[in-house]
């Protein structure tokens, strides 16, 4: 999986532990702690492809709910509130899903 090759296990664990409680997820802090912000745009796009479980070219709301599991099987599901907030922050064109460029822009904002 792309995550293991691009991100450090310790950083993934630290990030997941920090957002273990329901409704505690903050995408900006998560991206920073897990090490995504430090990655190049190309590597962030590889992470996107790993999170795009159905390979549709988009991360839809249902996939977004399980985004933490994409980093580790130990990750929890996002709550509906967290999922909607994450989607609203990333979905700049309002199509209800996150495209690869929207994801990369969100990580590096």
UniProtKB/Swiss-Prot annotation:
GO-annotated molecular function: calcium ion binding
InterPro entries xrefs: EF-hand-dom_pair, EF_Hand_1_Ca_BS, EF_hand_dom, Parvalbumin
PROSITE patterns given in the database record: EF_HAND_1, EF_HAND_2
SUPFAM superfamilies: EF-hand (SSF47473)
Keyword Repeat found: yes
Record-listed Ca(2+) 1 binding positions: 52, 54, 56, 58, 60, 63
Binding site for Ca(2+) 2: 91, 93, 95, 97, 102
Gene3D superfamilies reported in the protein's UniProt record: EF-hand
Record key words, sorted: Acetylation, Calcium, Metal-binding, Muscle protein, Repeat
N-acetylalanine sites (modified residues): 2
GO cellular component: cytoplasm
Location of the EF-hand domain: 39-74, 78-109
UniProt KW Acetylation keyword: yes
Family: Belongs to the parvalbumin family.
Job of this protein: In muscle, parvalbumin is thought to be involved in relaxation after contraction. It binds two calcium ions.
Protein name per its UniProtKB record: Parvalbumin-7
Species annotation: Danio rerio (Zebrafish)
